[in-house]
């Protein structure tokens, strides 16, 4: 941050002592002159985890399970950033509410984050149809046409197979369709 004194410079100086800052430099403070701070933070990877079909008609809720797992795995290496509920087309064989979930993380260790999430999902899912897909990267827009198709109607196995190379399929139950479809809608709440 660079500015002419005031609150912005003060805020950046305070942030330099925050947990997780690797290194910082700060200009001498003083009003009426240009000053600032530079912070170095660890580089984290964006990881999106889509899940679907974790419940049964009688119990459970995919959105709750996803949130609880995401909170449980958050630590100094992995930050839980967001949780998006994605409304899907109401296929007749859905488990309950026709929604899939995508959780967003910023992590220093994407493989460990995905492994831990998967282990907890396998332990706590109530369905043998659960799907889990992982996308590591900043821009999942290549999955958007598939995601929109799943929101508008049923898709074929061939359509699912075309997008599989874009994700890491971790649990391959029937819910994999919704799990993959949810990923490009991360933080798109419209």
Show where each model-derived region lies:
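Conserved mixed alpha/beta catalytic, RNA-binding, or beta-rich assembly cores of soluble enzyme
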Residues: 1-190
